[in-house]
UniProtKB/Swiss-Prot annotation:
This is Formate-dependent phosphoribosylglycinamide formyltransferase. Homodimer. Its EC number is 6.3.1.21. One of its GO terms (cellular component) is cytosol. Residues 120-309 form the ATP-grasp domain.
Length: 400
């Protein structure tokens, strides 16, 4: 797609975002830089990407009839899934029946919507190294799986995001509570889970991998720290051995080649020395990749937009996207109930090498990521500290 129209005109190039959170918002902004007409959809009103889109729709994207009505009415040239909670079989059918373009492809969206499809592809079809695992449907199966993989282990709903429903079990005392949480924390309600054996890794990385018209290119590895299964900090580049980096790129290429299509993938990997294990892959920008808003000339969102549109991404096949030096991000979390209001914004931005993104989340109920601080410095440690200091300076209030 190298010819682009004018938005809100008969020539418009229309892109439909299925999912309108903070990552979708940045994708929408990058698409609009190329004059793309952006339509944003999600299950709730005033989602972040809706605030910058040309039009928006609220619907249950797990409802196949509602999804078909939306797509028929908007007639998008491209559909870009931005979350997992979508009736992906509808996308597969529309791709087959009508040639509807889905990013990166309808099969990739279907396989990656839950952990079972992608884990079986990686481990059983492609033979990639992974942690030991079992899929379970009942409490009895769950206990058998724990006995098989051993403690410590991790349990996750097959369909969840941002750490919801995920627990690390370190002793038998954790077993019952972890199962209960997994049954209430998944996007599709109670049901199937994965029990994963624990890998004694040195660190985790996200290897952002771009499939584009010119081939496959990679961003420098992103290190990250999680708490309660959710991203708290990320930094780029993560130091690692040449052998581990090479193996990481090989694994990322294998899984993304099989999924196919154009777009950016977030490939999550465990690393210990020169050894690398596949963990998960998302066929879209990744939350840990928010650091690329300051660490790269082309952020993960700009890369995704360019790849979607068939445009050059600034690197050749097998090449690495340009990086600006040690950079870090720190997530901003709000706790409680209400509409977020931010104080001391000037203090958070006092250092000239810091930046701030407030996502525009319409409401917080419980706890929610509402923004991110970003920083560059002479070292990763210094960049992380700057991002933390900026985050600590910001006040977050919740109003009724």
């Amino acid at each position: 797609m190298t010819t682009l129209g004018t938005p809100l005109s008969p020539s418009a190039t229309r892109v439909l975002l299925l999912g309108s959170g903070e990552l979708g918002k940045e994708v929408a902004i990058e698409l609009q830089r190329f004059g793309v007409e952006v339509i944003a959809a999600d299950r709730y009103a005033n989602a972040p990407a809706m605030q910058v889109a040309h039009r928006s729709h609220v619907l249950d994207m797990l409802d196949p009839a509602a999804l078909r009505v939306l797509i028929a009415s908007e007639r998008p040239h491209v559909i870009v899934p931005e979350i997992e909670a979508i009736h992906t079989e509808t996308l597969v059918a529309l791709e087959r029946e009508q040639g509807q373009k889905v990013i990166p492809a309808a099969r990739a969206a279907r396989l990656t919507m839950d952990r079972e499809g992608i884990r079986r592809l990686a481990a059983e079809t492609l033979g990639l190294p992974t942690s030991p695992y079992r899929f379970v449907d009942t409490a009895a199966d769950y206990r058998e799986a724990i006995a098989a993989v051993g403690l410590p282990c991790v349990v996750k709903p097959v369909m969840s995001s941002s750490g919801k429903g995920q627990s690390t079990l370190r002793s038998e005392a954790d077993i019952d509570a972890a199962w209960e949480y997994a049954q209430t924390g998944g996007r599709a309600g109670a049901g199937r889970c994965i029990v994963e054996g624990f890998i004694d890794f040195d660190y985790e990385i996200t290897l952002l991998t771009v499939r584009h018209a010119g081939g496959t290119s990679y961003c420098d590895p992103i290190g990250h720290w999680q708490q309660d299964g959710d991203y708290r900090e990320s930094w780029q580049p993560q130091p690692m051995s040449a052998a581990a980096l090479r193996r990481s790129q090989e694994i990322a290429k294998a899984i993304t080649d099989d999924l196919g299509g154009w777009g950016l993938f977030g490939v999550e990997l465990f690393v210990k020395g020169d050894e690398v294990w596949f963990s998960e892959v998302s066929p879209r920008p990744h939350d840990t990749g928010l650091v690329t808003l300051v660490s790269q000339e082309l952020s993960e969102f700009a890369l995704h937009a360019r790849a979607i549109l068939g445009l050059p991404v600034g690197a050749e096949d097998g090449g690495v996207i340009g990086q600006s030096g040690p950079s870090a991000s720190c997530a901003l979390l709000a706790h409680g109930n209400g509409v977020p209001v931010f104080d001391n914004v000037a203090d958070a931005l006092r250092d000239p090498n810091t930046a701030l993104r407030l996502f525009g989340k319409p409401r917080v109920d419980g706890h929610r990521r509402v923004g991110v601080t970003l920083a560059r410095a002479d070292s990763i440690d210094a960049a992380r500290e700057k991002a933390r200091v900026a985050a600590a300076a910001l006040g977050i209030q919740l109003t009724a």
